[in-house]
Regions:
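Non-catalytic accessory segments flanking enzyme active sites
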Residues: 11, 42-46, 56, 77-166
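Beta-propeller blade-edge and WD-like acidic-aromatic loop motif
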Residues: 6-7, 13-32, 58-79, 103-125
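Short intrinsically disordered, low-complexity coil segments enriched in acidic
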Residues: 1-9, 167
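Short coil/turn segments that connect the beta-strands within blades of beta-propeller domains
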Residues: 5-6, 50-51, 94-96
Length: 172
């Protein structure tokens, strides 16, 4: 609770999804920062000078986690992590940089240092040896899919076909 802010941010599910709310110290709601059919995973950093909040959310896909930045009033929201996948980030105290550790179904863990203006500074871990091993080895990749359940809820999943998959053959 920074003294100069005179307010605080809270992640709450009061609208049915986990979203960020901005309150004054008397408990009065100033504004709802995020809205929509997605979940905010957590608040990563505040830039008090620029009045920006950095947060991780599932916006776009429930199977992914991305870093976003928005103004305290919720405007000017922008996704910062460019690659698809599950991102785990650490934002610098001044809000200028972030360390991004991510992977997805076709990319082993990558670790990169970025500016919050969108410039990659350094790829620290690329797992090139893992990528080379996958290319040389008989490997069945995961395939993502989604469907709508009987209650209308969208569900995501993946399947792995046999390496020698034959679409004309029947499988158990």
């Amino acid at each position: 609770f920074p003294d100069e802010l005179k307010s605080f941010f809270l992640v709450s599910e009061s609208d049915g999804y986990a979203h960020i709310y901005h309150y004054d110290y008397d408990g009065n709601l100033l504004n709802q920062v995020t809205k929509g059919d997605f979940e905010v995973i957590g608040i990563d950093a505040l830039d008090l000078k620029k009045k920006k909040i950095y947060f991780t959310s599932t916006e776009g896909s429930s199977t992914e986690r991305h870093l976003y930045v928005a103004k305290f009033d919720g405007s000017s929201k922008k996704r910062l992590t460019p690659e698809p996948g599950q991102h785990s980030v650490s934002v610098s105290p001044d809000g200028k940089y972030y360390l991004d550790s991510y992977s997805n179904v076709s990319t082993p863990r990558q670790v990169e240092m970025w500016t919050t203006k969108g410039k990659m500074i350094e790829k620290m871990v690329d797992n090139q040896s893992v990528l080379e091993f996958i290319e040389k080895t008989a490997y069945a990749a995961k395939e993502l899919f989604s469907f709508t359940a009987s209650d209308g809820q969208k569900l995501d999943g993946y399947y792995i076909k046999p390496i020698d998959f034959d679409p004309g053959k029947s499988y158990p």
